[in-house]
């Protein structure tokens, strides 16, 4: 079976963006 590469890439991008947003919120709270 072949895994849908597009789906995994999209999921990885979403996780990366969510992590960036979380870190940004954390930094904003620290300031």
UniProtKB/Swiss-Prot annotation:
Coarse class of the protein's main subcellular location: cytoplasm
Keywords: Cytoplasm
Domain of life of the source: Bacteria
Location in or out of the cell: Cytoplasm
Entry GO terms, CC: cytoplasm
Known role: Modulates RecA activity.
Similarity field: Belongs to the RecX family.
Protein name: Regulatory protein RecX
Provenance organism: Methylophilus methylotrophus (Bacterium W3A1)
Gene, per the UniProt record: recX
């Amino acid at each position: 079976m072949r895994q849908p590469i597009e789906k995994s890439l999209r999921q990885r991008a979403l996780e990366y963006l969510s992590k960036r947003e979380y870190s940004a919120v954390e930094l904003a709270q620290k300031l």
